[in-house]
Regions:
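Extracellular glycan-recognition surfaces and repeat-rich motifs
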Residues: 11-39
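Short, ordered beta-strand-loop transition motifs
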Residues: 28-37, 43-44, 86, 98-100, ...
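Extracellular beta-strand-rich recognition modules
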Residues: 65-69, 118-125
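Extracellular carbohydrate recognition and processing domains
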Residues: 89-118, 128
Length: 176
């Protein structure tokens, strides 16, 4: 049996990890469709993001990972981005634009190198007063254990905790 771990410490947005945001953005945590969300609402034009920063022992070990989240944009397009800091410099290995008025699944593969100093998962709302960007169900799982057919590992509670799907493999259309 392969152990599946979600390395993101608060995948269900339960406030165990606090996001950061500039003063140009209001951050709150609505529940929509029985799902907790991180919402960034633009108050003034400028930096328009809210983000989670993983450092130290919260950074997954070096390797290839599948990153997933659910994202939403309103009043302007938004972006979901993953940043990595290595050697004091930031790179953006994953970025997806979310069209105004849409909810999308963001999926991508990143490679975390040895010596990664910081990993950031960010929602950037459009640079328009009142624009909203939201994200939920954040997943960072080793690419070799990720299985989209069983929902990835996004429901795991914390690093080191098995995903619910580890007990049985269920495919779309199976009797539940």
């Amino acid at each position: 049996m392969t152990l599946r771990i979600n390395w993101f410490p608060d995948p269900n947005i339960t406030h165990t990890v606090q996001p950061s945001a500039p003063s140009t953005v209001k951050v709150d945590f609505p529940v929509v469709a029985r799902r907790n969300w991180l919402r960034a609402t633009v108050l003034t034009v400028g930096d328009t993001y809210a983000q989670y920063s993983l450092q130290g022992d919260r950074i997954p070990p070096a390797g290839t990972y599948h990153v997933h989240c659910c994202a939403f944009a309103k009043h302007a397009n938004a972006f979901t981005r993953v940043y990595m800091k290595v050697g004091g410099k930031y790179t953006v290995p994953l970025q997806k634009e979310i069209a105004d008025g849409t909810t999308v699944d963001v999926d991508g593969t990143i490679t975390i190198p040895d010596g990664c100093e910081e990993l950031i998962v960010r929602i950037a709302a459009g640079n328009v007063v009142g624009a909203i960007g939201m994200m939920s169900d954040i997943l960072i799982e080793r690419a070799d254990t990720y299985d989209a057919a069983v929902g990835g590992g996004f429901r795991a509670s914390s690093p080191g905790t098995r995903c619910r799907a580890h007990r049985s493999v269920r495919r779309a259309g199976d009797v539940r």
